[in-house]
From Swiss-Prot:
GO cellular component: cytoplasm; ribosome
Superkingdom as given in the UniProt entry: Bacteria
Name of the protein this chain belongs to: Ribosome maturation factor RimM
Localization per Swiss-Prot or TrEMBL: Cytoplasm
Organism: Bordetella avium (strain 197N)
Gene this chain is encoded by: rimM
């Protein structure tokens, strides 16, 4: 364990579920089905509570174990030390993520992108991607609808209007992470 400057691009990727074995390994429940980022990162930041500052740990070894990842962290040498980390959130710097394959995206990169629809042949800015979540078939974008000034459009009950859009090639025409833009042919809702 060491003290380093806290990166400003930390992304929460999982939670320590328990100790694993007697040699200080921990078992991490990832927030997504893929533990590739956890396995590839050589540094993790762990936060014991939501209000505590994360502390950096060097990852000595990590491997996928079913739906979890198990890891050995520098400075954690026995089961008691590993058990003390139970419940801690696991964070990784976005800069340490491996490059995504072509036409694949990290969900964290999609959040905040402007969402456009081109149903009638012209691009219309619908809103901003607020969240990405999974269903059994594919990922879903939750888009908060906005006016031309970027203010949320409200429904009859005063709540922000939203659209749920399947993140599939049949409806998503282009994704430009650098420009923070997603183009689609998803129909506009009235």
């Amino acid at each position: 364990m060491s003290e380093r400057t806290l990166p400003d691009d930390l992304v929460e990727l999982g939670r320590v579920a328990s100790a694993y074995g007697v040699k200080g390994w921990i078992k991490v429940q990832p927030h997504s089905a893929q533990a590739d980022v956890l396995r590839a990162a050589k540094q993790w930041w762990l936060a014991a509570t939501p209000k505590s500052a994360p502390r950096v740990y060097a990852v000595q070894q990590c491997r996928v174990h079913g739906a979890t990842a198990v890891a050995q962290l520098e400075g954690i040498a026995d089961r008691d030390q590993a058990e003390a980390l139970r419940g801690a959130t696991v964070w990784v710097s976005r800069a340490l993520f491996p490059a995504a394959a072509e036409d694949e995206y990290y969900w964290i990169d999609l959040v905040g992108c402007a969402f456009y629809s081109s149903v009638s042949g012209s691009d219309v800015r619908v809103g901003v991607v607020e969240e990405v979540f999974d269903n059994p078939a594919h990922a879903i974008l939750r888009v908060v609808c906005q006016d031309a000034e970027g203010k949320a459009l409200l429904d009859a009950k005063g709540r922000a209007r939203e659209m749920l859009v399947p993140f599939v090639s049949a409806h998503i025409q282009a994704v430009d992470i650098a420009a923070r833009r997603i183009d689609s042919d998803w129909p506009l809702e009235d």
